[in-house]
A protein has these predicted regions:
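Nucleic-acid endonuclease domains
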Residues: 1-70, 77-177
Length: 177
């Protein structure tokens, strides 16, 4: 895992994008504006790593492909947090996004108070299908800190320890080549 500071200009750009565009174009479980903002921030930071700029919502729905690198389609999944990420943490993935034609998932956590993004790791869709755990809508899940929440949609989980670890932007790019 590695953590980077998020440029305030990127955050402001993402706020404008979320105010102008609805990034929850699914039939259900579209996420709140705050959840959409978290996702757009994570996606924009990772896009910027690869020289792809920031998210531009005017192009419409991206079919689950946030960027392409080394001929691989990549979907960036970002969870919002108010604590630093730990290796034992879990990443959530909505089942209804499973049909997208994506080769790679990059899982991130955005610390909303410190405004830093942690790249937790990445995994191929093929490996994700093998390693993930499924929880139907309404399941009660227990977090790392022993608090609980009820799933609002069918959900997959994968732990940080099951992702390919990366130590830097360069390491991430080299592993994805």
């Amino acid at each position: 895992m590695f953590t980077v500071s998020v440029d305030p200009k990127l955050i402001e750009h993402c706020k404008v994008m979320v105010s102008k565009h609805d990034f929850g174009k699914r039939f259900t479980a579209n996420g709140t504006k705050e959840q959409q903002l978290t996702g757009i921030i994570g996606q924009s930071v990772v896009m910027d790593f690869f020289g792809k700029g920031y998210v531009d919502g005017s192009y419409g729905f991206d079919e689950g492909v946030d960027l392409v690198f080394a001929d691989k389609t990549i979907d960036v999944k970002t969870m919002g947090r108010t604590t630093a990420v730990k290796s034992g943490y879990t990443n959530n993935f909505l089942k209804l996004q499973d049909y997208f034609d994506t080769d790679i998932y990059i899982f991130c956590s955005y610390h909303k108070i410190k405004q830093v993004l942690t790249v937790c790791g990445w995994i191929s869709k093929e490996d994700f299908v093998v390693k993930r755990r499924f929880y139907p809508k309404g399941s009660i899940r227990t977090r790392f800190d022993k608090t609980t929440f009820t799933t609002f949609a069918d959900l997959y989980e994968i732990d940080n320890k099951d992702l390919n670890n990366v130590n830097s932007i360069t390491d991430l790019k080299n592993q994805l080549k």
